[in-house]
């Protein structure tokens, strides 16, 4: 039966231990114990193992032990994770008389941040013997004292606690006194002598006794004091207090001289034996004597020094009252003073283990810091709550009593707020409450979350051609909202190919400054638009970037001189020979000088001047300012030299202007010499010279050949129109169009082909928009002859469609004016310049005054008009004012619109080509008689067809 009960007891004990261990793990605390005075290196516990930490990670995770006041008493060996005694532990010095004594440790590890709480109980050993405050106590006892009279003695004190401080007293054997033990509230004991036999001073005037105190430790320690009892003569009544124990409650922090209590004692004797004096007992320690004092006459106890609840909350004061009898008699009482707590201590805030700086992409819930708070007050005055600065992306989370974690509550953005100054406020529960604050500076570390940004996504730059190599043409700049290396922006070209060359052969960009340089001279005639992208990348990992589109327009400069074109009468740049009848009238066209300029705009606008070969010579010829046509100014006579050498100066309108000189040799012949001269002259003889005595068979042969040629051209045109055009990326485009309308034929020819390639998408052909009111027209090849559609449409003029508009690409750069010969007028209106078109043909005799014709070198004749680049739309021409031709800027294409009479002839020699020779055919008609010839000259006009 006993064995079974023993087993049940062991099981209960084990179950209790398991529950206690589970509670400790759940609460996050470890408990160890160690005896005081243990030697250095004494084993306390395997703290790393008990906390579930690996030995290999103790150093990596910065394992450390912290204690507020006793940090050097215990230490942890990081090699084996054992907690050991580091220095001498004296329990009496550490905790005094407190029953419970422990050392509170905080174990902190990082990565992740964790805090563990460890309590090490310091156990007492019996290392202190009982001690009396004096070696001898004197007692004066009147002989008249009655039996069982009690006389308190000063007890011994033991610095140990528990069983080691439990004292037992023993009195040396005698016949008069016995020893009685009184237990106090704090479990202390003090001895009392009890009179068992009446004293007789005459028999024994004094007694010597020995009081011995023994503690409960093992081994036992003892202490003793001598008792000297003086037997006095009779003062029969001792003073008596109202009650033996007085209890007083008062608040701490009372000012000096504050009354604690007024004691009252009485003595039944008379006279001097009734007079009493109050005093502190010899049992009162000096600490209490410093804080309180007693008025020996009135018995008032007052505050003498600061009394603090946090130092001690109770005071036990022993008071004696002594009469003035002889011998004097003494009465005893005890005053218990209990202090009430006041809220006189502000909380304390300690911030430890900061994990700074915090990356702006840190996850919500990341622990930033640990915060501990404390308050020396008690009760509600010592209950502390923490709060944080409002409107911040952080919060406080309570992890343990008086411990908080500062964690991330919402996402951070360094570009919006780069640092936070947090204020942690700890407030107690007193009334009024007290508080304390602590500042926490949280710096937000940057991550690469912003790409470089340009102010605009696209820029347009205008650069003149023939720039020096390495010329700075533009500077790109991007801004990155990040910091440090994440904000370091570098620039580079987005490489691609332009035809057969790479983009980097044209331009480069400085990686740091963003300056864009032209690596070689740009040529407007070769490349009019250079479009590319510049990339900006930051220095982050991974890098972020963005692109900028840069459009570089190459502006034309006058770097090409006019070039003379070859004519049937002579080679290009050489002398041209022409035969002229002396019978021609004024205004007769003798020859035409053709020139071309590779530039564009005003730089390609050519004008012609006639220079005399001989100084002072009177020349009966003039040259059209813009047409290059050499005509007679008067009727020729016999005084004119039979051979005229004409020098024609061709110059453009650039700054400075460039020139070329053409030489025309004119031979004046009589009508009878014309056939002979024609056999020696070139094929450039004017078509107006009558062919006399031509064989009828020759005329039939010419007509047959001409008919065959016309049929061949028609068949060729039909085949070309039926073939589908093909276009390649960035390749040459052939915009072809021939239309016939009520006002004449519209022809489009292309000789000099240019293109603008952006590298993105297919190349765009020249755009031509026509009024839908015009009749449909067939398409022919650019290299073919002009075709016109006959019918009634050529006789019925129609109003141009007002919906015709310029393309947006044609309103970007340079512009030309409308040049009208004779009656040309340029008027400014609200919608832009108005063009008024002349009603005369190019065969109308020119006045003696200067001409206002457009530049022939630019591909515009006297009855043509040009587009204007500008923001406004030009005013539409009225009925009958449709222009003969127009130029599409940026392209060599010229659209010719000419109203031809039914009997008009097209002079193929008037076609002008840019960079390509076009075959010229002249049709000669035989006419009889000079009079008939003059009438035909006045009635017919030669129409110039312009080419590009």
Swiss-Prot record:
Recorded topology in the membrane: Single-pass type I membrane protein
Transmembrane segments: 696-716
Alphabetized GO MF terms: calcium ion binding
Cysteine disulfide partners in this protein: none
Cytoplasmic topological intervals: 717-948
Signal peptide: 1-28
Protein name: Protocadherin alpha-10
Lineage: Eukaryota, Metazoa, Chordata, Craniata, Vertebrata
Gene coding for it: PCDHA10
